[in-house]
Design a protein with these regions (language model features):
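Short beta-rich binding modules
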Residues: 1-132
Length: 132
């Protein structure tokens, strides 16, 4: 069984530390008669008034990969853009976000799975093309 793919418009983007005592990002997408949010992935530790702050390299890389996949060079520029989303097999969560025209996808769930298994942020280097 293949996962369902739908066209969507990005209707909201956020970076917030309001509800989780950490900095998270979210991308909200809407299609014909449906909508959902992708994210709440941690990109940093800290909150208003905190004594300790830290950033997650993998979270920032994920944001950059979303921007690259959809085709925006700014986070704010994502809002209003069109994309494709691929849902998990059970249809309850977005597995991948894709470019509307190009066959270009970012598997956000697999990315964070690998990130949680890695001991350093060097896992992202595995995806760099070789220099000629």
């Amino acid at each position: 069984m293949s996962n369902e793919i739908k066209n969507a418009q990005i209707t909201g983007i956020s970076i917030s530390m309001a509800d989780h005592n950490c900095l998270t990002f979210r991308v909200t997408v809407q299609g014909a008669c449906w909508g959902c949010s992708i994210g709440n992935y941690k990109i940093g530790t800290g909150m208003l008034g905190a004594d300790y702050w830290d950033a997650s390299g993998s979270g920032v890389v994920a944001m950059m990969k979303i921007m690259d996949t959809v085709g925006s060079d700014t986070w704010e520029g994502l809002k209003g853009m069109y994309c494709r989303v691929e849902f998990t097999e059970d249809g309850t969560m977005v597995q991948k976000i894709g470019n509307l025209i190009k066959d270009k996808w970012f598997d956000i769930r697999e990315f964070f799975k690998k990130a949680s298994e890695a001991t350093t942020a060097t896992y992202v280097l595995d995806e760099r093309p070789e220099k000629k």
